[in-house]
Amino acid sequence: MMHQMLNKKDSATHSTLPYLNTSISWGVVPTDSVANRRGSAESLSLKVDSRPGHIQTTKQISFQDQDSSSTQSTGQSYTEVASSGDDNPSRQISFSAKSGSEITQRKGFASNPKQGSMTGFPNIHFAPAQANFSFHYADPHYGGLLAATYLPQAPTCNPQMVSMIPGRVPLPAELTETDPVFVNAKQYHAIMRRRQQRAKLEAQNKLIRARKPYLHESRHVHALKRPRGSGGRFLNTKKLLQESEQAAAREQEQDKLGQQVNRKTNMSRFEAHMLQNNKDRSSTTSGSDITSVSDGADIFGHTEFQFSGFPTPINRAMLVHGQSNDMHGGGDMHHFSVHI
C-alpha cells in the first residue's frame, strides 16, 4: 500500500515538473554513501531566507522498497527548518522525487542530520530553468493579440523573453469580410446609403455603371496647373491676386512720386539758370533797355517798347500787340532793336 502511494506521488511529480532540473547539496556527504546514478532525476526547491543563530530542527522521512529482481529505491525527504523567537519565522522547504535505479543518500543524512542546518545559508545549486511554449504576438494595428491562425509557426522562447516587447508583425494579406472598417463619422450615412442603393440594383440585375475614380482627370490637370508653395501645398489664388494688385498700385504711386520729384528738380534747375542769367545781365547793363520799332510806311507810327529785366504781363501784351501790327501791316517788315 505504501509502495503504491509513493508511486502515485512520484508520477504526479513527474507530470507537474517536466522542465525543471535542480540539485541540492547539504554540506559534506560521506563518499561511501554516494553511488552511480542510472536514471533521470527531477527535483524542485523552494528557498526562503533562513537566519543563523536560531534553533533549527530537521525531520527526515524515508521509505524503501526492495524488489527481488533488482534493487530499486524510491526516497522522499521532507526537511523543515524553523526558527524560534520570531513572529515571522523563515522557513526552508525542499522536497525531491527521484526515480530510476539509484541508491539514496539517507545514510549520510542519518549520520549527520544537522550538518547542513548548522550554517545559516546552505549550499543550493539551481540549474537554469528551461521551458518551451508559444505565445501570441501583440499587434499595434489591431490593438490586441493576433489570432494564432495568422501565425502557423509560432517560435519558442525562454521565460526571460516573455516580458520583452515583440517587434512589429505584418498584417495578414487576406482579411475576412467580417473585419470592421473604420470610416469618418460624417461619411457614415452617405456610405450606407450608397451601399443600400447598390444592393438594390444588384438584386434587380441592372447594369451598374463603372464607379468613378477617386480623383477626376480634369481635377488632376487643374491641380497640376495650380501654383504651389515651397512645401508643395496649394497657394491661395485670391491672396495672390490681392498681393499682385497691391504691388501694382505701389509701383504706380512710386512712379508718380518719381515724376513729381523729377519735375521739381527740373523747375529748380530752370529757375537757378534764369537767376544766373539775370544776374549776368544786371551786371553788364549800364542803363535802361530801350526797344524801338520803326515802320517804313509810317502807317502805325513809331512805337517804343521798354522792357525791364524780368518779363511782366504788360510787356508780354505789348510784345504780342507789336507782332499783330507786323502781321496786319501791309508795308515793310518791322525792325526791332534792343539796346542792352
From Swiss-Prot:
Cellular component, GO annotation: CCAAT-binding factor complex
Gene3D superfamilies attached to this UniProt entry: 6.10.250.2430
Pfam families: CBFB_NFYA (PF02045)
MF term (GO), any: DNA-binding transcription factor activity
UniProt DNA-binding region: 212-237
Chain segments carrying region Disordered: 43-116
UniProt xrefs under InterPro entries: CCAAT-binding_factor_CS, NFYA
Keywords (A to Z) from UniProt: Activator, DNA-binding, Nucleus, Transcription, Transcription regulation
Keyword DNA damage tagged: no
Composition bias, Polar residues: 78-103
Domain of life of the native organism: Eukaryota
SMART domains: CBF
Biased composition (Low complexity): 60-77
Family note: Belongs to the NFYA/HAP2 subunit family.
Function: Stimulates the transcription of various genes by recognizing and binding to a CCAAT motif in promoters.
UniProt subunit comment: Heterotrimeric transcription factor composed of three components, NF-YA, NF-YB and NF-YC. NF-YB and NF-YC must interact and dimerize for NF-YA association and DNA binding.
PANTHER family reported in the protein's UniProt record: TRANSCRIPTION FACTOR NF-Y ALPHA-RELATED (PTHR12632)
UniProt protein name: Nuclear transcription factor Y subunit A-3
Naturally occurring in which organism (per UniProt): Arabidopsis thaliana (Mouse-ear cress)
Taxonomy of the source species: Eukaryota, Viridiplantae, Streptophyta, Embryophyta, Tracheophyta
Gene it is expressed from: NFYA3
